[in-house]
C-alpha cells in the first residue's frame, strides 16, 4: 500500500511540475516594466499619444551587443496604429531604456544607433503573411548600402553592424526595395503602406 501511495504521489508531483512548466512558457517573454517604461516615454514625448489605449509589446529581440534588447511595440494615436521600437539594456534582471522611441504608421521603419560606441543600422517592420523575404537599403553613402534578409514572423528586426568611422547621417536610407517570394520586387505601396 505504501508503495502505491508513493507512486501516486510521485506521479502527481511529476504532472504538477509539467503543468507549471507549461504555464511558465506561455507567459510573456518580457517583463511588464518594459511596457510601463514605453508607455511613460510615449506620454512624455508624443503629445498625440492616446494613453487610454493599450501599448502592446509585439516582439523582443536580443541586439548584437551583449545585454541589449530591442523591443517592437504598437500604440494608438490620432486615428492611426503606430509601430515603434525602443532599445533596453538588461542589468541584474532590470531593463533600462537607452535608445529609440522611433515609430511609424507605415509597415517599415529604419534607424541608426550606437550600442557601446559601435554604430548599427536597424530596420524593422510588420510582415503580414511573411510576404517580405529581403530588403535592399540604398544609402547616401553608396558603399554602405546593404541587403537585409528577413526572417519569418509577423514582425521583424534586422541589425547591420557598421564600421566605427561611419557617418550615421549618410546612413539614413533614402530608398528601400522590398523583395518577396522568388525574389520579385514588391511595389512600395504594398510593402510599406
Question: Language-model features: where?
Answer:
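Sec-dependent signal peptide cleavage junction
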Residues: 18-29
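Exposed beta-strand-loop-beta-strand "reactive/processing" segments of non-cytosolic proteins
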Residues: 47-90, 186
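Short beta-strand edge/turn micro-motifs at domain boundaries
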Residues: 88-102, 189
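Extracellular ectodomain segments of secreted/surface proteins
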Residues: 99-124
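Short proline/glycine-enriched turn/loop motifs at strand-loop junctions of beta-rich domains
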Residues: 127-133
Amino acid at each position: 500500500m505504501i508503495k502505491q501511495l508513493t507512486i501516486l504521489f510521485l506521479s502527481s508531483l511529476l504532472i504538477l511540475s509539467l503543468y507549471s512548466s507549461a504555464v511558465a512558457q506561455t507567459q510573456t517573454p518580457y517583463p511588464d516594466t518594459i511596457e510601463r517604461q514605453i508607455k511613460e516615454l510615449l506620454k512624455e514625448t508624443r503629445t498625440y499619444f492616446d494613453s487610454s489605449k493599450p501599448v502592446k509589446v509585439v516582439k523582443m529581440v536580443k541586439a548584437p551587443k551583449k545585454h541589449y534588447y530591442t523591443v517592437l511595440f504598437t500604440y494608438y494615436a490620432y486615428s492611426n496604429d503606430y509601430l515603434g521600437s525602443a532599445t533596453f539594456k538588461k542589468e541584474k534582471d532590470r531593463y533600462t531604456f537607452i535608445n529609440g522611441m522611433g515609430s511609424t504608421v507605415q509597415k517599415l521603419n529604419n534607424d541608426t544607433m550606437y550600442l557601446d560606441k559601435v554604430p548599427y543600422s536597424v530596420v524593422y517592420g510588420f510582415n503580414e503573411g511573411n510576404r517580405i523575404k529581403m530588403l535592399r537599403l540604398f544609402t547616401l553613402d553608396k558603399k554602405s548600402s546593404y541587403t537585409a534578409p528577413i526572417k519569418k514572423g509577423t514582425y521583424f528586426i534586422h541589425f547591420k553592424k557598421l564600421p566605427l568611422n561611419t557617418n550615421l547621417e549618410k546612413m539614413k536610407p533614402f530608398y528601400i526595395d522590398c523583395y518577396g517570394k522568388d525574389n520579385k520586387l514588391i511595389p512600395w505601396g504594398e510593402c510599406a503602406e
